[in-house]
């Protein structure tokens, strides 16, 4: 959707405001089930890295729906709890697969060796990189040949793109690095969405638009300007 800066009209995407014809527009982001499904996938990928790579017991990981567009993940009883902002920054780079260097993943700048490249059975990021690069063991040899042929710089760029677009976990670095941040209490309402922050015992089945919505059957008068249909508590609302 778009919101007109001049008159405040909210409408579907277009180049000018349908009410006052102004081209001064703001784009509005409205989360949906597809958005939440994508975020859930990132959370599950994060849990895999925390448990498999960092050896954190899954019993010490708690997941909460933030009340808006994402989830909060809490880790307790872990040596990582004592990390400062700088160390958390290094951890963020690892989780998001940032600043990966080709040497770490098999490509030595001088005289690269085929045997040094990661294998699909390798643990941690080596295995994830191999799966992304080669897809299957049968394609590994041919893939390595192309990587060496393309050169060091191309491989470094490809690792960077993989971190941004595919295998890197999408988290909020500003939240993770801030050791003084105060988080919303579970059970409280998010002022942007009106949904509650809730603990998620089963994130794969969790539906925030049903479970975190606290409306009941009592009629409530509201003022709304929203040109799309949405669902809360399995009921349809809009467009308004």
Q: What are the language-model segments listed below?
A:
Residues 58-86, 90:
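Histidine-centered divalent-metal-coordination microenvironment in nucleic-acid enzymes
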Residues 1, 26-34, 214-225:
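Short glycine-/aliphatic-rich beta-strand segments at the starts of folded cytosolic domains
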Residues 93-172, 176-179:
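Long, charge-rich alpha-helical interaction segments
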Residues 192-194, 205-239:
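C-terminal accessory/binding modules appended to enzymatic or scaffolding proteins
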Residues 8-13, 23-27:
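Cys/His-rich microdomains that often coordinate metals
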Residues 36-54:
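A short, contiguous, amphipathic alpha-helix enriched in charged residues
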Residues 4-7, 17-20:
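Short cysteine-rich clusters marking metal-coordination/redox-active sites
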């Amino acid at each position: 959707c778009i919101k007109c800066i001049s008159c405040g009209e909210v409408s579907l995407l277009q180049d000018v405001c349908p009410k006052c014809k102004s081209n001064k527009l703001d784009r509005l982001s409205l989360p949906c089930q597809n958005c939440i499904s994508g975020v859930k996938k990132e959370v599950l990928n994060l849990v895999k890295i925390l448990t498999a790579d960092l050896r954190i017991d899954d019993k010490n990981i708690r997941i909460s729906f933030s009340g808006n567009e994402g989830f909060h993940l809490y880790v307790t009883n872990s040596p990582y709890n004592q990390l400062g902002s700088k160390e958390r920054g290094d951890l963020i780079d690892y989780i998001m697969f940032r600043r990966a260097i080709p040497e770490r993943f098999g490509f030595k700048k001088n005289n690269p060796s085929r045997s040094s490249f990661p294998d699909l059975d390798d643990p941690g990021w080596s295995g994830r990189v191999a799966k992304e690069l080669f897809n299957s063991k049968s394609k590994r040899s041919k893939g390595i040949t192309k990587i060496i042929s393309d050169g060091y710089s191309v491989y470094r760029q490809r690792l960077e793109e993989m971190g941004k677009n595919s295998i890197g976990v999408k988290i909020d670095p500003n939240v993770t690095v801030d050791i003084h941040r105060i988080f919303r209490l579970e059970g409280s309402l998010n002022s942007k969405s009106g949904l509650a922050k809730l603990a998620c015992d089963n994130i794969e089945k969790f539906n925030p638009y049903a479970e975190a919505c606290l409306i009941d059957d009592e009629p409530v008068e509201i003022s709304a300007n929203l040109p799309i249909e949405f669902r809360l508590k399995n009921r349809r609302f809009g467009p308004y």
